Design a protein with these regions (language model features):
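N-terminal hydrophobic targeting/anchoring segments and the immediately downstream early-domain regions
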Residues: 1-208
């Protein structure tokens, strides 16, 4: 299938032992599974698709139907009245720092960052049930913890997908870790340690 290129050569750096100091840079705040939040219809595109970039890097249906105009959430967040609804392969208007409703963490782009030295990635599972209830389009539950658990499952599916691209279980660069020792091992193996976090106003269903 057609795929985004990374245009990077050479092997990623690693440690000489599993226990030494680690080197690399950190992305400490990302919402990599945001395609499932706010009911699952507010974010356009996703980090991967079994059929590659042409299916993962697409605009939301409501944006496409109006030619990129009338996308209220995108317009409010970006300050732009409209945008080119075509993602792959032209990417005229997105991804972009001001375009918060469009995918920016496609797996090949993350691979480029990893090959360029990123070694720690903090992925925050995110939800806001009140905004979800207000947004008119949805396919998922607005309950914070339902959404958080769904995004956590998607993180593991994402890891499995990257593993498959690199030859099998455990071979991919994206490795979910649960403690500092695991993170050190992963980074010194030349891979990227991924920390799962939560950003929600209603953790564990306390007030919803």
């Amino acid at each position: 299938y057609p795929e985004s290129q990374i245009d990077v050569v050479g092997g990623p750096h690693a440690g000489v032992s599993a226990f030494q100091e680690v080197r690399g840079y950190v992305d400490a705040h990302t919402h990599g599974m945001a395609f499932e939040f706010l009911g699952g219809e507010a974010h356009c595109g996703k980090p991967w698709d079994r059929y590659g970039a042409p299916y993962a890097l697409v605009d939301c249906e409501d944006h496409t139907l109006t030619g990129g105009y009338g996308a209220a959430l995108e317009t409010f967040l970006s300050g732009e009245p409209g945008h080119d609804p075509v993602g792959w392969p032209t990417f005229k208007d997105w991804p972009a720092p001001h375009s918060l409703t469009h995918e920016g963490t496609y797996y090949r782009w993350m691979e480029r960052a990893w090959r360029g030295g990123q070694r720690l990635f903090v992925n925050l599972l995110v939800e806001n049930n009140k905004l979800c209830e207000i947004y008119p389009l949805k396919r998922n539950s607005c309950d914070d913890m339902d959404s958080i658990r769904l995004q956590a499952r998607q993180m593991h599916k994402f890891q499995d997908y990257i593993d498959a691209q690199f030859g099998g279980p455990g071979k991919g660069f994206y490795r979910i870790v649960t403690n500092p020792f695991q993170a050190r091992q992963v980074i010194n193996a030349g891979k990227m340690a991924v920390i799962m976090g939560i950003e929600t106003s209603v953790p564990f269903g306390c007030t919803f």
